[in-house]
Amino acid sequence: MATNYSANQYEKPFSPKYLQNWSLAKPTKERISSHEGYTQIIANDRGHLLPSVPRSKASPWGSFMGTWQMPLKVPPARATLTSRTAAGAASLTRWIQKNPDLLKASNGLRPEIFGKPHDPDSQKKLRKSITKTVQQAPSPTIIPSSPASNLSSPDQLQSSHPSAGHTPGPQSPLNSPKCPPGSPCLPHAGRNLAEV
């Protein structure tokens, strides 16, 4: 034991002389007054509840689900059905709703499901109907209000495509390097542009 040990060695800093608080001390009772009621013993000395104490069926932790109560694979919290087939989307939603305890738990899953699944059969039917309409398209006709309808030869027809005739593309001049002068690819070989 240390030679300079004193039982009240830590009391000196809290004395009024050092704290310099010269206020009056609070009056204390010689004997404390008794409280109303009594202490009910509900546990033994080891902290276990006595058998006479009524127990609640509910967990004291509420609906919290621990790691060992959770399923081995937890479904995703945000599921997108957009790029899935109808069977895949049904399987995913069944998996999410399979464990109701996980959905009800306070720390459980709050799933958000977005999008609609696509049906490959309806996609095939849609593609077939599109190809049928393309194959059954009417023959091309001349659009009278189109600026391109004032062509030099009447056998040049306009396309039935909606964008045809609205914005004509760049026209190559007759003396283009692709067709040499005097070749049969020109409609009027040897003529000037001013004559046509």
Curated annotation (Swiss-Prot):
Primary place of residence? Answer: cytoplasm
Q: Which InterPro entries match?
A: Fltp
**GO cellular component entries:** apical plasma membrane; axonemal B tubule inner sheath; axonemal microtubule; ciliary basal body; cilium; sperm flagellum
Q: Give the residue ranges for region: Disordered.
A: 107-196
List localization entries.
Answer: Cytoplasm, Cytoskeleton, Cilium basal body; Cell projection, Cilium; Apical cell membrane; Cytoplasm, Cytoskeleton, Cilium axoneme
One GO biological process from the UniProt record? flagellated sperm motility
- Report the Pfam families cross-referenced here: CFAP126
Keywords from UniProt, A to Z, are: Cell membrane, Cell projection, Cilium, Cilium biogenesis/degradation, Cytoplasm, Cytoskeleton, Flagellum, Membrane
Q: Report biased composition (Low complexity) as residue ranges.
A: 137-149
Q: Which domain of life is it from?
A: Eukaryota
Tissue expression remark = Expressed in trachea multiciliated cells.
Ranges of Basic and acidic residues composition bias in the record: 113-124
Subunit-structure text: Microtubule inner protein component of sperm flagellar doublet microtubules. Interacts with DLG3.
Against PANTHER family, the record matches this protein to: PROTEIN FLATTOP
Per the record, the similarity remark reads: Belongs to the Flattop family.
Its annotated function is as follows: Microtubule inner protein (MIP) part of the dynein-decorated doublet microtubules (DMTs) in cilia axoneme. Acts as a regulator of cilium basal body docking and positioning in mono- and multiciliated cells. Regulates basal body docking and cilia formation in multiciliated lung cells. Regulates kinocilium positioning and stereocilia bundle morphogenesis in the inner ear.
- Record protein name field: Protein Flattop
Source organism: Bos taurus
